[in-house]
Design a protein with these regions (language model features):
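Bacterial N-terminal signal peptides
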Residues: 5-14
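Short, flexible, surface-exposed loop segments at domain boundaries
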Residues: 16-77, 82-416
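N-terminal secretory signal peptides that target proteins for export/translocation
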Residues: 1-2
Length: 416
């Protein structure tokens, strides 16, 4: 009887420990976005080649300028959006305020950014308060204000403007585009002569709105809840106000926003065609003499026209990659050592894929499978019709003699 009691006790204890174990993404799987921690902050540092950087995270305290830069790393399948379109980290200007959904490091031993205690977001950091340095620093979704609002169905409604010498303050609230019962929070946002104002195909200045009589040359004016989209940054402010954000861009109508989205979409399409589509190996069926059939899932967040280039019967090239999405080799171009083959199948999942996955699975056969094509590994693939170009040195792994090349360490990040 005693051994059954002890067995039950150990089972209960095991279940308790399991229940308290914090969630971490698993290799070869796309994590549920619902389990991510959400925060926002200003982009203050970028290491684009290693897909990492630092944010000044907005916490519970009121002294934003004191918040130390908080390192983050993009997961291999992370979705980055800027101006409502797919983006690479290099596309986003420093100072941009970004919305984040992130997880704990999948494997702390291989983290490219500092690993923090799992409860770090709850710790008080002096006058900065809590939340400024969350341990959830491996990012699934990174998006600017305009992208966030479009995804969530939100708009900024401008209440009034107070202006002097082409700079001043706008009182605005972020609300559901279609209305609702929730009471929006009003926010004071600064602007100045450098703020870009977009209307249709025009790029205007504050002085242009003043000249047209839409804004006063000096003083206050009601804007009657005008619905717009905003680009938001942060900059130091006078008068002892430590947490106040700044308008970098103001899109007055849908046409202007759509044009910004189109420009960024084309920028990213050209980037992916030159760097290849990132994907995850699902399965490999090995044949004889180096032959293999590879099944893989293309990563999500790209423009649909890129996925449309993967057609059954078409030729593809596949090259190994690291979790930073660096090509495994590139001294003679990524195509030099790539596996080449024919697409046997291209299928689309019937259900909505998790964030990070396109839901598009490809299967191709190659007569020379490379080491990087193993189940659970990240790789890059391109249709043969995409341009064959060389990638810059910082975007591919060398001869393997330098471990930092494959596995960047957090050593570059200063401790504050």
């Amino acid at each position: 009887m005693m051994k059954y009691v002890l067995g039950s006790l150990f089972l209960v204890l095991g279940l308790c420990v399991s229940a308290e174990e914090p969630f971490r993404p698993e290799a070869g799987k796309f994590p549920a976005v619902e389990k991510a921690h959400t925060y926002r902050g200003e982009l203050v540092f970028v290491d684009h080649a290693n897909r990492r950087g630092s944010l000044r995270v907005q916490g519970a305290g009121g002294t934003y300028f004191r918040n130390a830069p908080h390192p983050f790393a993009l997961l291999p399948y992370a979705v980055v959006r800027y101006h409502g379109a797919p983006a690479d980290l290099r596309d986003i200007p420093l100072g941009t305020v970004l919305h984040v959904k992130a997880f704990l490091p999948p494997d702390p031993k291989l983290s490219a950014v500092p690993v923090l205690p799992v409860d770090n977001k709850d710790k008080i950091a002096g006058y900065s308060g809590t939340g400024v340095a969350p341990a959830e620093n491996h990012v699934l979704l990174l998006e600017d204000e305009a992208s966030h609002c479009q995804r969530e169905g939100l708009v900024w409604k401008l209440k009034d403007v107070d202006i002097k010498n082409n700079e001043g303050m706008i009182v605005a609230s972020c609300e559901p585009k279609d209305g609702g019962n929730a009471k929006p929070t009003t926010e004071n946002l600064t602007f100045d002569a450098a703020t870009r104002i977009w209307r249709g195909r025009e790029c205007l200045s504050v002085a242009d709105l003043v000249a047209e009589g839409l804004w006063p040359a000096s003083g206050k004016k009601s804007l009657d809840g005008q619905a717009v989209q905003l680009g938001i940054t942060w900059r130091p402010t006078p008068d002892g106000i430590f947490t106040r954000f700044h308008i970098s861009d103001l899109w007055l109508d849908d046409s202007a926003m759509q044009r910004a989205t189109l420009v960024q979409t084309e920028t990213h399409k050209a980037f992916i065609r030159s760097r290849w589509m990132p994907a995850l190996v699902d399965n490999v069926e090995y044949g004889k003499f180096g032959r293999a059939t590879v099944t893989a899932t293309l990563f999500g967040g790209m423009d649909t026209s890129l996925y449309a280039d993967f057609q059954k019967g078409g030729q593809v090239l596949a090259n190994g990659a690291e979790n930073t999405l660096k090509h495994a080799g590139g001294a003679y171009g990524p195509a030099h050592m790539a596996s080449k083959g024919t697409l046997l199948n291209v299928t689309k999942a019937a259900v909505e894929p998790p964030l990070g996955s396109s839901g598009i699975q490809i299967q191709f056969e190659t007569d020379l499978v490379i080491e990087g094509l193993r189940p659970g590994r990240v790789f890059r693939v391109r249709p043969a019709g995409w341009p064959q170009v060389q990638v810059p040195r910082e975007e591919y792994v060398g001869d393997g003699s330098n471990a930092e090349d494959r596995f960047p360490t957090p050593i570059i990040f200063p401790k504050y």
